[in-house]
Amino acid sequence: MRLQANCCRIAWHWALWGWCLSLVLSVWAGNRPPNIILIMTDDQGYQDLGCYGSPSIKTPFLDQLARDGMRFTDFYAGNSVCSPSRAALLTGCYPTRVNIPGVLFPRDSIGLHPDEVTLADLLQSVGYATACIGKWHLGHHPSFLPTRQGFDHYLGIPYSNDMTIDPKAQLAQTVRWREGMSRERMLSQAPKKNWVPLMRDEEVIEYPCDQTTLTQRYTREAIAFMQANRQRPFFLYLPHTMPHIPLAASPRFRGRSAGGFYGDTIEELDAGVGLILSELKRLDLEEDTLVIYTSDNGPWNLKNGHGGSALPLRGFKFQTYEGGMRVPCLMRWPGVIPAGSTCSQIVASLDLFPTLAGLAGASLPRDRTLDGVDVLDLLKGGVFAGDGVPRDHFFYYRGRQLEAMRRGPWKLRLHQEVELYNLEDDLAESINLAERYPDRVEAMREAMMAFDEALKASSRPAGSIQ
């Protein structure tokens, strides 16, 4: 009852957008493009869902999502850290191509260039209502914020929750100060780590934000957005703050999971997904909505219940081993995606850009290079082999350095030593076959060098306020 009441209080913020166009857009009823809900967690490991084999974390709603849709075994984030991964997702490009190779901080003056065409830009251009609710992390200055990158509305934190605040941030007149903070103290004191602002659109509305409330606040905001835009196609991008450290969970979930504090955060995320799915059903939008759940990269290598698990993969966040970039991914679209199906083909987050644009009827930009490929036929359950697969390779960047390449089952990694693995037989990357297959190593090395050279020759600038 409390959640429903809170949703009603939030709903007025979205109502004007939904109602003012409902009559015009009602002609789409029965033949409109699908709603798209894209949920992305922060630093969630490959194993950290029941449907991916977690021995201790319970995720009944996400497990049901897997049973009702498709589970991906070989889905890759665009990078092994936050900002580059998000840039890849929203532009359909390897992050080096758009010059977002590393994590952005409150002190930085750069962000995703306003001239980049984002997924939200494309969907907005064909009539979608768009909202970003959660962690942005592609630049916190006004020209880089979601409202300048194709989103009608934004609620969330501008970067990671272990950061600080930029004292130059625009403050709302009704900003809520917490922990004894005030405008004067914010300007006179050194920024405090883990104290981050909560923003609505382009203004700070709470500082420091109460991180124990974020998952539930994002969920309420998402539900209100869905309610207000039920009569038109909508794109809900929900990049959750959790389970990035410092971990936080509401009192209801704190201490509940056998997976420790980290498990608490995942189980609260799962409950939030359950509420969103329930609301879709209540609004009679299940058949009209594609729901996607994934993570921005692999988990932190942390103990004491604060880090996730990438097992059976090797590696963690920051690394180009599989555990750093292969992430869980679930998709459901009743009547289109076969229920209870599994996709074991290579798919990457940058493929969502052309795939979702195609579903929405949006034209891809022709004045720039994209790296994503349309994988709609895979979502429909298509079976491909040999040269017919939509994607047969993937490149693993670490910063500006191209460290690895996958081609089919083979993966070449060039870091401190030359490593060659057959992922089909050796998912844990434990048996180095480089000396056994020197010709394969050389062919893949040449392919890596050629791709990297071409990419950097055609890369586009990041945005800068200087």
What are these regions (language model features)?
Residues 11-26:
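Bacterial N-terminal signal peptides
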Residues 2-3, 7, 25-418, 423-454, ...:
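Formylglycine-dependent sulfatase
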